[in-house]
Amino acid sequence: MLGGLAYRFGYLSRRFVQHNSFHFSTTDKALAFGAYPFLPSLGLEETNPGCYHSGKWMAGSESLLSYNPHNNSPTASVNLATNDHYEQCIRAMESERDRWMLTPAPVRGEIVRLIGEELRKHKGELGSLISLEMGKIKVEGDGEVQEFIDTCDLACGLSRTMEGKIIPSERPGHFMLEQWNPLGLIGIITAFNFPCAPLGWNAAIALVCGDLMMWKGAPSTPLTSIAVTKIISRVLDRHGFSSVFTLC
C-alpha cells in the first residue's frame, strides 16, 4: 500500500490467531457437501485446490478437511499448497508488479468497486458458508461480507483523494513534489473467527493503493478463503490482472 497510509489504515493484520482444531484428511465420515446446496454456487466442490495465482488453481498432495463445528461433520477437503507453489505465487506477483503499480489509482478504484458488486451478488451464500465453516450465526456471516463490501466502496472513493503536497523551494523556478508510492508485495493473514471481513479491510485499501497481495487464510476455514478468492479473481481476470491477488 502507499507508504504514508500504511499506519493509518493498517494494511496488514496485526496478529495471527492460531486455531488448533483443523483436521488433516483422516476420517471415516462421509463428506456432507451435498447437504449444502449453496456451496456449488460459490464454485466449491467436494475436493478443492487451495492455491491460486495467474488464473490457475494448484495444490499439492497434502490435504485437510473443513468441518462443520456444530456437529463435527466434514464438509469438503482442500489440497494444500507446497513451498514451490508459494514461490510461483511470488514470481507471478513480481511479473505484474510494475503494471499494476503504474495503473492510475482511479482505475484501480473502479476495479475494487466491481469486486464489491460481485460480493453483493453472493452475499447470502458467502454468509451461509461463513456460518457453516466458522460456527457464527448467519446474520454475523452476512455482516462479515457486508464489511468487505463497505470497504470496497470506501476504497473506491479514496482512489481519487490520495493527493500529495507541493512544497515551495528555496531555489528560484523550482518546487518540491510529494508523491505516494505503493509498497509492492504484501501479505494478509486472517484468523478463523473472522475469515472474511479483515481481508476486505486490508485488501480493498491495498489494491487501490497499487499493492499486490498474498492471502493466508486460517486452516480451519479454507472453503471461505477459496470462495472469496474465486470472487475477487473473476473481477481481476476480466481486467487483465490475474496475478495481483494470490492465495497460498
Task: Tell what function each PLM region has.
Residues S73-M162, G173:
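Glycine-rich loop-to-alpha-helix module at the N-terminal edge of alpha/beta enzyme cores
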Residues G50-H53, L65, P74-Q88, L236-V244, ...:
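Histidine- and aromatic-rich ligand-binding microenvironments
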Residues G60, Y86, K123, G141, ...:
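Alpha-helix N-cap/helix-start motif
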Residues L2-S77, E110, L114, G164-T190:
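Terminal low-complexity tails and localization/encapsulation signals of metabolic enzymes
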Residues G164-C248:
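Rossmann-like NAD(P) dinucleotide-binding subdomain of oxidoreductase/dehydrogenase enzymes
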